[in-house]
């Protein structure tokens, strides 16, 4: 591995295999993989109960329609440390973003979801922004396999979770979650497996000078 510092952010459609691929890639690279672990770390840092972060995890705040109409987004300023706004969705997002930035500054790692590509937008020389997607047939099949549900339930979960992630990304970034201009490496996982996705990502890392 090169000595060049890097962070990989991964956004993923539900059922695309993005999370599993990221976890396997982290093991191969010998670096940390952060997904729900960020919730616990943020809770410990902020002294706010983890349940608040879990309830708000990758979900839009209460003013989604207003934000869509006015095209505004919360500022990535320092979070409030006290007062009635301390557990607002915007403030919880600021706490979480602060943890993500600290992780990115201190180690090579993979960060899944939570608008990592947006939170680290000022560090793009050291960030690889990945978006993993796939066709409906592939995703439904993977959801059935991993979640052990029937086809109808898999389709419902896919639509519901994708809608939630889309709204979350729009609410906190003002951006279209699936706008590929916001990513360095979009990956269509419809016709390749997890191992092949890892090969593809590693090849891109070599092109960027992060792997020898």
Where are these regions (language model features)?
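Pre-Walker A (Motif I) flank of P-loop NTPase domains
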Residues: 3-8, 107
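Glycine-rich phosphate-binding P-loop
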Residues: 10-23
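Short beta-strand-centered segment that lines the nucleotide-binding/catalytic pocket of NTP-utilizing
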Residues: 32-43
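Conserved beta-strand scaffold positions in the cores of enzyme catalytic domains, especially
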Residues: 33, 127-129, 184-186
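ATP-dependent small-molecule kinase phosphotransfer cores
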Residues: 43-108
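ATP-dependent NMP and nucleoside kinases share a basic, alpha-helical "lid"
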Residues: 99-147
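Long, contiguous binding/interaction regions
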Residues: 102, 114, 118, 133-137, ...
């Amino acid at each position: 591995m090169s000595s060049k510092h890097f962070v990989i952010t991964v956004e993923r459609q539900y059922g695309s295999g993005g999370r599993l691929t990221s976890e396997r890639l982290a093991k191969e690279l010998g670096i940390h993989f952060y997904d729900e672990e960020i919730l616990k770390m943020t809770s410990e840092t902020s002294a706010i109960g983890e349940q608040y972060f879990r309830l708000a995890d990758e979900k839009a705040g209460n003013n989604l329609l207003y934000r869509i109409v006015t095209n505004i987004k919360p500022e990535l300023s320092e979070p409030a440390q006290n007062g009635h706004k301390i557990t607002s969705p915007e403030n919880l997002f600021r706490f979480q973003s602060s943890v993500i930035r600290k992780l990115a500054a201190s180690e090579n790692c993979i960060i899944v979801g939570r608008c990592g590509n947006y939170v680290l937008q000022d560090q793009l020389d050291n960030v690889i922004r990945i978006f993993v997607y796939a066709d409906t047939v592939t995703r439904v099949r993977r959801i059935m396999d991993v979640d052990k549900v029937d086809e109808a339930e898999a389709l419902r979960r896919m639509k519901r979770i994708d809608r939630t992630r889309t709204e979350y990304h729009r609410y906190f970034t003002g951006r279209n979650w699936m706008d590929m201009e916001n990513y360095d490496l979009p990956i269509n996982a419809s016709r390749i497996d997890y191992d092949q996705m890892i090969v593809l990502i590693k090849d891109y890392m070599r092109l960027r000078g992060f792997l020898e």
